[in-house]
Amino acid sequence: WKLGMNGTFAWTPSINKGEKRSPADQSVGKQLPYVPKYSATLTGRLTYRSWSLLYKWCYYSERYTMTNNDITLTGHLPPYFMSNVTLEKGFSLRWADLSLKGTVNNLFDEEYLSVLSRPMPGINFEFFIGITPKWGKKKR
């Protein structure tokens, strides 16, 4: 058995440092639209022989939708959390290494927006098959 964990944290102060384009321009000195100021991930992996179970948790802070950073009904997107889980099985064949992987994205069926008025998918599933040929390697 092997247990591994890692995480990331990003502080992204994406500030408009340009010049005002007009007297009404309120964007200078403000966070750029759709860029979360904070984001974080935490990943845990449990491995046993050729099996691997991965859990990934993600956080994205509030994002503004307008350059003036107004917090109105349509001027910002709320923060959200996301959880994904993956189960993977590896196989070693004479001619290739094979990987079968199934993922459940948005495990808890969270409602969230990455862009205003564009709902993102609820719970969804992915299946992957990976083949790594062993060309040029001696077969035993």
Located regions from the model:
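Residues embedded in well-ordered secondary-structure elements
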Residues: 31-33, 44, 76, 91, ...
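Residues that define the transmembrane beta-barrel architecture of outer-membrane proteins
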Residues: 34-40, 79-83, 121-125
